[in-house]
Amino acid sequence: MAPTFTNSNGQPIPEPFATQRVGQHGPLLLQDFNLIDSLAHFDRERIPERVVHAKGSGAYGVFEVTDDITDVCAAKFLDTVGKKTRIFTRFSTVGGELGSADTARDPRGFATKFYTEEGNLDLVYNNTPVFFIRDPSKFPHFIHTQKRNPETHLKDANMFWDYLTTNEESVHQVMVLFSDRGTPASYREMNGYSGHTYKWSNNKGEWFYVQVHFISDQGIKTLTNEEAGSLAGSNPDYAQEDLFKNIAAGNYPSWTCYIQTMTEAQAKEAEFSVFDLTKVWPHGKYPMRRFGKFTLNENPKNYFAEVEQAAFSPAHTVPHMEPSADPVLQSRLFSYADTHRHRLGTNYTQIPVNCPVTGAVFNPHMRDGAMNVNGNLGNHPNYLASDKPIEFKQFSLQEDQEVWHGAATPFHWKATPADFKQATELWKVLKKYPNQQEHLAHNVAVHASAADAPIQDRVIAYFTKVHPDLGDLIKKEILELSPRK
C-alpha cells in the first residue's frame, strides 16, 4: 500500500502543487499552510558543514576479533577471538567544502564508530600516519592556510607554502601528501592510521602506549597528479561513487587491524617523543601485531541522516582505552564534540547513527536541550537522587599510572633539524618504487609554481633540507613552470 502524502503535522494533502490564491490570477493567501510549510522547511534544509572533513562518504560494516590481545587491552569487544561488533565508517577529504572534488590532494579522514556493549568507541583516524602539527594552537592557523584567501576567496599557494615552510615540523606529512599517497585511487584502496598515541590497559592493571593501523586488504592504489586533476573535473564525486557501487555489488572492502605497542620504559628510551604527531614508530623496533579485521558491507539508506549527521570524537572511548598526553589529541577531545554541538545540537548523540547500540544512555543531569526526542528520562529526578538507586559499574583500573610533575608553563614545540630525519628516510624509501621520487618532486613543483618567487625559494630550501637531490629536482621544474625574468 502506497503512503499517503501529508504536510508536517500529518494532514493529508490532496493536491501537493495547488496553492490558495484570490481567483485565478490574484495574490496568494498566507493561510495556505501547505505552501508555507513546504517553503519554510526548504529554507532550513542545510545545516553548518564541518569546518574540516566536510566532504565525505560512509558505510556500515562489522569488525571481528582475529587474534587475542587481552594482554594489552581488556575492552570487552576485544575479549574473544571471533567476536563481532557492528561499525560505521566515514571517509573524507580534509580541506574542501561539501561540493569539492574527492580526488583533491589532501589527507583523507578515516573515522570508525564501534557500537560496543560498553558504549560507542570512535577511532577518528586519517590515511596518513603523521600530521602537519604537534602544537594544537596552530591548528586553526594551519587550516586557514589550506582553505581560501579572505580577500580573493581563492585557494592561495602563497598562504599554503608560507605556513608550511615556516613551521618545519610539517615536513614529514608534506612528503606523504605530495607523494602519490596524497591522491588515493579510492577510499577502499588506502590505509588508516591512529597517528596519535593512545593508552590501552589489561585486567592486570598494566598499560601500554599504542599506535593503531588499518591496512587495506585491497592493497594501496594511487592516482597521479594529472589523473586526480582530470577526475576532479569529470567526476568530482568519484570516491563516493566507487565506494557505494562496490558495496552495492557485493564487493565489500575490508581492512586488517594491527597495533604497535610501547611500555613506558621503552617510550622513555625512544629517540622521539611518543606524543609527537609528526613521527612514526619504526616497525623493526616496534613490530606490528594483528588483532582484527573489519568489512564494510552495507550502504546507508539516507546520506544526510547517516553520513552528514554522523558525529565522531576521540573522547568517545570505552573502558581500558584512553587518550595519551599527546597535546593535539588532548585538544581534539574537546573540539570534536564542541563542533557537533554547533552543527547538530546538544542532543546529537540521540541521532540514530550516533546512538549507542545498548540504547542505555542514563545520565540524569544531562537533560532537555533542543531536539531532545528520547523521552528525556521521563519523571526521573534531574540529579543523582538518594531515593532512586543507580548502579555505578566498576572495572579494573591501571595500578601503575603516569606521574607528572611541574608548574603550569607555556610550551611551544619548536622545529629542529631532527624533524627532517624521518622525512629523509621516506625520500630514500620512495627510491625503491618506480618514478615515486620524480612524482613527489613534480607534484610539489606544480603546486608551488603558483606561488610568488620568494615563497618558491623557501619551498626549495625546505625540501633541500630533506635531501639535496629533492631540492634540485623541485627547483628545476619550478623554474620551468614559472620562468623568472
Swiss-Prot record:
- Report if keyword Heme is assigned: yes
Q: What cofactors are annotated for this protein?
A: heme
What GO biological process term is on the record, naming one? hydrogen peroxide catabolic process
In terms of Pfam families, this protein maps to: Catalase, Catalase-rel
Q: Which EC number(s) are documented for this chain?
A: 1.11.1.6
Keywords, sorted A to Z: Heme, Hydrogen peroxide, Iron, Metal-binding, Oxidoreductase, Peroxidase, Peroxisome
Per the UniProt entry, the disulfide pairs are none
What the entry lists under PROSITE patterns is as follows:
CATALASE_1, CATALASE_2, CATALASE_3
**GO CC terms:** mitochondrial matrix; peroxisomal matrix
Q: What is this protein called?
A: Peroxisomal catalase
Q: Which reaction does it catalyse?
A: 2 H2O2 = O2 + 2 H2O
Q: What is its main location?
A: other
List the gene name. POX9
Assembly information from the UniProt record? Homotetramer.
Q: Which enzyme type, at the first EC level? A: oxidoreductase
Do you know which SUPFAM superfamilies this protein is assigned to? Answer: Heme-dependent catalase-like
Q: Which family does it belong to?
A: Belongs to the catalase family.
Gene3D superfamilies, sorted = Catalase core domain
